[in-house]
């Protein structure tokens, strides 16, 4: 929070102090002083008036208890100032000070903006006087929120301290009756509508306990006066810790006595139309919904309060209102909340995600035989019974009353239903901890229910026995005996029937924990945990018939149907009719959800729940081998194809020769179980249910492998399975309806997208051999595995991409592949849609008779028939697909291929204009350093195309633009790119995080780079300590060199930049230290480090351009410059003189020196004491004249830096013309505001003075820039 701007007389006053409740007169006095001085300090011109108003201020302070007098005085001051912003501040300040609005008569004061601030203040503070003022003038406030000129304040953002004069609005307590009186009068059909800030404020105030009922005010002995300022006793209780009115009742619950009634009253207002717009209702409900569980006493609400809030929210729930599960993240994190929901069954309907499971089972018997699991699930190690369950009063009931017994059983059934639903929800969202927790609760509940049922059976058996004994000792009358016997017999039959029903319940298992085993099994695969797999295998492989194995069926259902592949997302994933929002009717109403919304919303939820990026399966090859050996052994009984389908998916994420071999070992056993038969009309598959799923998965895997261009595994599938092409085509058709398939291909090839990287090292695989890719292409075409029609073109597109990236590819190879594509009329892939009218030719000439609409990728001649360059065609088509992949992969070989296909003259002709989005050419410079000249040439050419649509179409390119840093720091192909996406090591060095930087550098120890970060981007030496520099140097020094060890193991980390030479690292540190005037670091290197400072190469470096540039940096002070002018008998002087005096110095040097002169002439004057002959070279004078810096030139002549002899006749004429023009401006008094400040006195240089004084007047150039002259 910022400080209030005050003048020195009142600087001791801290405006942050909460003022509204004044404890003594001194506080009032301080406040009035601070407020008034703040008003005047806003404007420099107004400060003068403050002295005139000292008498008025004294008068105000003398009469500070007379509110009417103070109001009149402040009103007069504000009106006279006449500044709208000041009016707003003063007005709101006065509201906050005296808690009552001022009815200003001046028109400017009661402007629309001020009306809004009054309303805002009233909503935030609920100040009754302010509310009454609004009611009194409600006509003025009508339609306030609809006025487009008034931008309402976002209640989530803090109001500017300037606007509130640094005053936090203190919320008062308000009586419930007063609040609703205001609400009903102010917000009616003819009044002002609710705004968002009102909704937010009222709900927050209610939950903070700021609204109290009349009963409570009487208990607290509060007086109901016209002002609502609380007394001291009331203040302690109400304004203390937000624990107002929270009194513990007998049950130990905290009782919120005001919240339920207040919320119900607001609900009534909503229902009666006072709050009549859906948007406002929605905002209010969402605020309430989100505020309620955030309250720290939430879990201690009693049932009465819960029922109130349930009744309030339920009528207003809309199907779309809380559709996303992640809008209520607290539900998934809190066991207590779930327990709470279970205890209050009415309340859990508020959570649609849980409610859906209840709806799903409303019309089905959860306890039917279909849910019985004959396995011994209780034996699983994961399901411990040591968690204490809830203490249920029903468990302690006596068993005498049959109805009570039945009720207790029904209660257990209800509890089990809820536990099932909640556990299932956590399983679906992969929260294993809570899923196991509620599974344990489920077991406890089942155990309790079994005990209760056994108890009931025993009591019924006793009752039957008592009936049997009583029948022998009953009445003597035959009639009565007969009737008694018949009654007893009927009762006995009823009891026996009850026992049968209870025993049937006892046989049933009220839960199914197959999901627990399934998820535990997948987790064990990920962790290569063979012992867990063994324990699960003992439980689930009871049924020897594979087709009826419930665990296997569950596997197929959960994985093959509902769980898309993690990295190769099957087209089925995009078919939302199957797995998307429409399967949740309680969350999404039919036809009321947005397609893109679904994709974003469900992608994460439906993704495979086993993330193996950092798993043992991925990283430890030995553990993976042991796991495979066990799974293939006879010891593993649950050898099912579905398990190995999952392993196939895991292996997709690993790209090594070993993983390819394991992939083949797994896939072939699956393929041997498939049998296919074909008919003349359609291709049919005669497979059982399991193999049909495997068959379908094969299709999914194939599509995935095409996407990631992994043609080794692709070839394995082609060799092993007769694919159901019709099925694949159907999936693609389904996918096309929902999301562009072509766009997905490009997404999968985005190497910088973390979601789709599949290589174990986090790099995109480009090790496909050209021969392998070509063989697969021939196999696809020769065996007609996939037709070359439009539906299957994506496979050939991806294959072409892999050929472009393959190792060993040459231009002739590509032309050979192009010929195959042409012969079979296969279209080439293209990034640009709807440009099929451009016909490209591979024979370096335009064939107008060629009507095949395809994109040529290499030998495109950008000329039209007249011989002129065809710019329009070039901009749209210029081999952009190759550019796209070269751009992403930054493949030097591929760039050369592309460049060779164009002549240099062609490049020069179409590279005349630059792309507007490029701020400078730093990218091209960097690329030229990092890659070959041909790569730099193509890179430059890409950006010089004005309408290169990829730049607009793919947001990923934005990171390549030179913003604060270039793509250099955010590029996967960069040798120092961090695989996990964290900061680049050069950024870490600039921030002084040396150890982190060098830890990172170890990851790329095999890479090299040619230079340190450029000086201009290094912020390292601004705040760095000397100890840090020593650490940086020590980290680059070899320690304990051992000749017996491999030299590469002992190289310091930074030597990867410069091999074994640490000197350049110190050179870099030295140049940066000079530029930042860090003489302590310079002393460390040049005085204490004798070994470095005495090297001939160091002396040579000190006289080089880098040091000269550092000495002339704006942050290098005169002391540092003088140090180097005298260092080692002035060895730097000659090089400085050479750079400053010679006229033929480089343009860059001219610019550097000129920039230094602009920033301050002090360094130049210091140099003149060491180089008496030093004067301005003609090139620098020429630079000043060229940039029209005539005032600067005149000033340098006045102080003697430049003489008339230094100027040419033309320059003298130009200077004379400028002086004449300047004099003419003075005479005619032209209105050139940006010219020399006429109020400044004429400056006459004092040549005798050696230092600049603070009294030196400022000079202004014609452009308005101020120059601070520094005298000799």
Curated annotation (Swiss-Prot):
Keywords assigned: Nucleus, Sporulation
Motif segment (Nuclear localization signal): 146-161
Biased composition (Basic and acidic residues): 393-403
BP GO terms, sorted: sporulation resulting in formation of a cellular spore
Disruption phenotype: Cells produce large aggregation streams under conditions in which wild-type cells form discrete aggregates. They are unable to induce prespore differentiation, do not express prespore-specific genes and do not produce mature spores. The vast majority of these cells participate in multicellular development and preferentially localize to the very anterior of the slug and form the prestalk and stalk components.
Low complexity bias spans: 468-487
Database matches in PANTHER family: B BOX-TYPE DOMAIN-CONTAINING PROTEIN-RELATED, PTHR32142:SF61
Described purpose of this protein according to its UniProt entry: Functions autonomously, very early in the prespore pathway, to control prespore cell differentiation, maybe at the level of transcription. Also required for proper aggregation.
Record's protein name: Presporeless protein A
Species in which this protein is naturally found: Dictyostelium discoideum
Source lineage: Eukaryota, Amoebozoa, Evosea, Eumycetozoa, Dictyostelia
Gene (UniProt): pslA
